[in-house]
């Protein structure tokens, strides 16, 4: 097993969605007390969940919602009831702001999400310091930059890219590598930039770099042809599971035998509708969670019992978000009926002090709100994630 402790860079990767120029006004979201936050019983803490529940990225949002619901049940006590309400943002920044406003009207006191990076950047860029925001999977440094109450459970782009390059330097030092990424996506390009930087330092042999601009692309034959002609034996592609499934099918159709390596966004590849999962055999990916790991057996069983499916990393990340919020509430010793700004400030201070044994590892947070936890590489074998 390859295990790297996170050391977080301060490189500033720009989030394209942050510049979406939203004209939607973000409502103030002070909660608690007379402003409608905690329920009248004084024990209910209202937590919002924002993510794509419909659309191309729905797997991420729906999984996160399910994981958060399980955690709310597990971490509620006789003195603290964690109440959840979800809103769909279709992985869109402007819709995420609308969802945030809707949850504010409900009386939200803390936010799990948004799930995708662009939406999270949009909300965190507008959010005042009167709301604790813990995103399960948004990875850009811009999500938490200059924010006092915003935290990430997912690795940052620099951490993920550098970790992947270090793994390849240790395990695949002789590989001829093609770098393949979505230049129009904040997450994909951010990880790719960090990978390229660390690859140079680690003296990896990158023989080709190919890009695309749309996750709905139906063919990568041109890019794969160039990678094959360059002699690439391994493709590092920090892309989402849908384009990854297309890439693997295209490679098979053209007789290109190579190893594909992805990152956490590729988790979900085995569940793509109509995808021949045998094509995923031997795929490498960096992810903090494996449903096949014995230490996660209780969670996996509870998830399967509740939803009749196997949890992915996004479900585990969201579970850890709610776990962290519950731990922060306990650590801060707050009165959940107090003013929302006071709650957020106290919870943010507590978040920087707590350490939780989460599903995705041992989690702590630095002053910038970025998570520090180990990154692990897995290989897909017979439909299971095996430590690489």
Residues covered by each model-derived region:
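An alpha-beta-alpha
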Residues: 150-211, 234
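Extracellular/periplasmic periplasmic-binding protein-like sensory domains
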Residues: 248-319
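Beta-alpha junction/loop-to-helix N-cap segments that form part of ligand/metal-binding clefts
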Residues: 38, 60-66, 74-144, 153, ...
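Extracytoplasmic "Venus flytrap"
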Residues: 48-67, 87-94, 116, 180-190, ...
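Bacterial lipoprotein signal-peptidase II cleavage site
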Residues: 27-39
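Hydrophobic alpha-helical segments within soluble ligand-binding/sensing domains
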Residues: 96, 153-176, 189-191, 217-221, ...
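N-terminal secretory signal peptides
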Residues: 1-8, 16-26
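Segments of small-molecule ligand-sensing domains
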Residues: 306-315, 326-387
């Amino acid at each position: 097993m390859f295990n790297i402790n996170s050391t977080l860079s301060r490189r500033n990767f720009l989030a394209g969605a942050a510049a979406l120029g939203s004209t939607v006004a973000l409502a103030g979201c002070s909660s608690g007390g007379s402003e409608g936050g905690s329920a009248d019983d004084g024990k209910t803490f209202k937590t919002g969940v924002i993510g794509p529940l419909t659309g191309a990225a729905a797997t991420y949002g729906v999984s996160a919602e399910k994981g958060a619901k399980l955690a709310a049940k597990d971490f509620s006590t006789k003195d603290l009831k964690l109440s959840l309400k979800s809103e769909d943002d279709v992985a869109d920044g402007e819709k995420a702001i609308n969802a945030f406003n809707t949850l504010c009207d409900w009386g939200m006191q803390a936010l799990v999400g948004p799930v995708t990076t662009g939406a999270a950047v949009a909300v965190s860029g507008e959010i005042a310091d009167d709301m604790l925001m813990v995103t399960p999977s948004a990875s850009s440094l811009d999500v938490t930059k200059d924010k006092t109450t915003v935290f990430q459970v997912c690795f940052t782009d620099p951490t993920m890219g550098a970790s992947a390059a270090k793994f390849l330097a240790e395990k695949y030092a002789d590989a001829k590598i093609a770098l393949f990424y979505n230049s129009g996506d904040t997450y994909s390009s951010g990880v790719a930039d960090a990978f390229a930087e660390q690859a140079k330092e680690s003296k990896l042999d990158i023989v080709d770099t190919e890009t695309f601009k749309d996750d709905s692309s139906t063919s990568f034959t041109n890019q794969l042809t160039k990678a094959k002609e360059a002699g690439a034996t391994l493709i590092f592609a920090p892309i989402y599971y849908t384009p990854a499934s297309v890439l693997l099918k295209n490679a098979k159709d053209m007789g290109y035998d190579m190893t594909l390596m992805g990152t956490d966004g590729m988790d979900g590849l085995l569940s793509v509708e109509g995808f021949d999962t045998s094509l995923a055999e031997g795929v490498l990916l960096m992810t903090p969670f494996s449903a096949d790991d014995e230490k996660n057996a209780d969670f996996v069983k509870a998830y399967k019992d509740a939803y009749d499916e196997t949890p992915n990393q996004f479900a585990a990340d969201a579970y850890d978000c709610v776990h962290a919020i519950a731990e922060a509430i306990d650590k801060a010793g707050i009165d959940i009926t107090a003013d929302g700004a006071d709650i957020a400030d106290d919870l943010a201070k507590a978040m920087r002090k707590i350490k939780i044994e989460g599903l995705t590892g041992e989690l702590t947070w630095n002053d910038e709100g970025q998570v520090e936890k180990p990154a692990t590489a897995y290989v897909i074998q017979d439909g299971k994630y095996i430590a690489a």
